[in-house]
Curated annotation (Swiss-Prot):
Enzyme class, UniProt record, top EC level: transferase
Gene Ontology MF annotations: S-adenosylmethionine-dependent methyltransferase activity
Assigned keywords, A-Z: Methyltransferase, Nodulation, Transferase
Family (UniProt): Belongs to the NodS family.
Function: SAM-utilizing methyltransferase involved in nod factor synthesis.
Domain of life assignment: Bacteria
Catalytic activity, EC: 2.1.1.-
GO biological process: methylation; oligosaccharide biosynthetic process
The protein's name: Nodulation protein S
Gene3D superfamilies linked to this entry: Vaccinia Virus protein VP39 (3.40.50.150)
Annotated organism of origin: Azorhizobium caulinodans (strain ATCC 43989 / DSM 5975 / JCM 20966 / LMG 6465 / NBRC 14845 / NCIMB 13405 / ORS 571)
Gene: nodS
Lineage: Bacteria, Pseudomonadati, Pseudomonadota, Alphaproteobacteria, Hyphomicrobiales
Length: 207
């Protein structure tokens, strides 16, 4: 279903924060715990993360309310979270309650981390970027943080869904940009049968 708020919003970092703040205030943000489609999406992400390997040192970009963070904390050797919103970090910390997790309030386009990671996960984040060069820069940041034998798990609604919401770069567009630096090794499509419930989850490695 098209969301008029998304169509009308100025998607600067401040605009993204304003847009997401009201969703984070809900008891079950984005219906992640109660929606079958969201559960399938989380399952596919974890399946791609864990397929045939350990997670090692993990970077999660965009934690929302912590549903994926909670799962990653169980399987990772170390877990670092980069999130744009203070409110999202607080919500995720309340849910996960793990003092070993490292939290950074940063923009994916301007990440400043002195580390390398075995697994980087970035889902439901990159479609908020509306300039191709900023998106290319965010992807380059991710590549630079990924170890040579690491894996990048990417997830996003498909192009048609994102465009119906007023976003320019959905899953197919991001993956096309990413393939100059990364190769796709596995890809899943999740379709919940309702408007807006159509996404891609992909595993990529460095070229």
């Amino acid at each position: 279903m098209e969301d008029p708020d998304l169509v009308a919003t100025n998607l600067s970092p401040a605009g993204v924060k304003d847009l997401l703040r009201k969703d984070l205030d809900a008891r079950d943000p984005w219906n992640i715990s109660s929606c079958e489609y969201e559960q399938k999406r989380l399952h596919a992400i974890m399946e791609l993360c864990l397929g045939g390997r350990t997670l090692g040192d993990v970077l999660e970009i965009g934690c929302a309310a912590g549903a994926l963070t909670e799962r990653l904390s169980i399987y990772s050797q170390s877990l670092t979270v980069v999130e744009l919103m203070t409110e999202a970090i607080a919500k995720a910390q309340e849910r996960v309650n793990n003092s070993d997790i490292i939290w950074h309030e940063q923009d994916v386009c301007q990440m400043d981390l002195n580390a390398k990671y075995d697994t980087i996960i970035c889902t439901e984040v990159l479609y908020y970027i509306h300039e191709k060069e900023r998106l290319r820069g965010a992807l380059e940041n991710i590549v630079q943080l990924l170890r040579s034998d690491g894996q990048f798990i990417f997830g996003s609604p498909r192009n048609a869904v994102c465009r119906s919401w007023g976003h320019l770069f959905g899953a197919e567009a991001v993956l096309e940009l990413a393939q100059s630096r990364l190769r796709i090794v596995d890809l899943r499509r999740i379709n919940g049968g309702l408007p807006g419930q159509d996404c891609v989850i992909a595993k990529l490695t460095r070229r």
